[in-house]
């Protein structure tokens, strides 16, 4: 809106958008209690507050950008699976409810042990559930397509299948070189922004940006799925949710950090086996299920969880 006459072009290497935004499996969440506790070991209370607030404001911006009716958001709430009460749960819930209260003007963490049986989870492996009423689900594919329609309506052009090979700056303009099959196509622009998340390491090798692969598994529809919501465990490294009568489960990167520190898409069979075991032994015990599909996505990580947004030049 600042420069309505400017021509804007987005170059996307995939036939369909292939970034982490389309592969996050629809978790509109901002951090489980154990993840926030883990962050607080290296971050101050103020930094933890700011981190959660940014995530919440990002979700609010998404809701403002896309009309709620089109976002198809499901407010089922979020839950964390607690396996052992090796910490003072009541004290920590009170502490972080107090810390994060100004963001919501409300408490956000509540014990929900009674729902372990209701949801059909393992009563021998779980000792508690923590409920968060402010977390939701979205359809990431539909969300991205609706964002595309908004951009197109404002005159923004999008070219898919444009794999950027290199760029150069000379004569007050950028020259961006793309390749599709064996065809080289060059674009020129006065200004340029690189928004490729983990893949930005290719252009900025000295930046604190490292790839981290995550995988998602989706079951076939189940006859009797007992739960709805977004669920996390193991300090947020593992997550699952319902999608209609299916279960979407993912994560487990912490089981093999070294192999998953890659920008190559693919499935880690060791992690896949662990996720399937969790479905059998914790989440869908006494239920038969089949895996229908799987995929991977690449995220970006650094020494800090703060996003890197900065200008490298005036252009």
Name each model feature, range by range:
Residues 246-255, 307-315:
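Short FAD-binding loop at a beta-strand-to-alpha-helix junction that anchors the flavin cofactor
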Residues 125-189, 195:
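Helical element adjacent to the flavin cofactor pocket in flavoenzyme catalytic cores
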Residues 134, 281-315:
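C-terminal catalytic lobe of FAD-dependent flavoproteins
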